Amino acid sequence: MEVAVKRKHVIEIVTYLMVFLAMWVISPWVGKLLDRLYYPSPRLFSDSFVIFLVSGMVGFLGLGLTMWTIVVFKTIGKGTPNPKVPPIELVISGPYKYSRNPMAVGGFLFLLGESGVYQSPSLAGLAVLFAVILYLNTVHIEEPQLKKRFGQSYERYCETVPRFLPTLFQRDEG
């Protein structure tokens, strides 16, 4: 039993380390590398403090949303975002009350903000590619697996909560 617990902790630590590296190191590095290869003048906007500030706010909003989802996965779902150690409980509170995939929304917002901060057209393109891949993964892999694992509870959840972007007026469950 202790080996399984240690394995779970190692997977959890590696997951968080990979998320950190992907967000703060790998994505800007890949964006800048692609900019150097394909764009002679890789500036999205003219130098503007307002663009920098707004982009930074969008990025930190995405980071905050991503961190919130990880905390909710750990505390309420008793698991991690890693499919090797998934939540045991269906998580439908916190940010999941408004979006079935707030972690994806947070990751997209972070990349989008990062692309503005670094003024990287390639990073903006990677953000869009990230969104497309997450959409396909969600529809074709995640949702069928969650329907199998959680059955009618998940189906009811899908009926009341939008897949990605929250609506201004949530449907009333009662």
Give the positions of each predicted feature.
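Membrane-anchoring alpha-helices and their flanking helix-loop junctions
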Residues: 1-93, 105-145, 149-174
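Solvent-exposed interhelical
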Residues: 96
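Extended, alpha-helix-rich binding/interface surfaces that flank or overlap catalytic cores
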Residues: 101
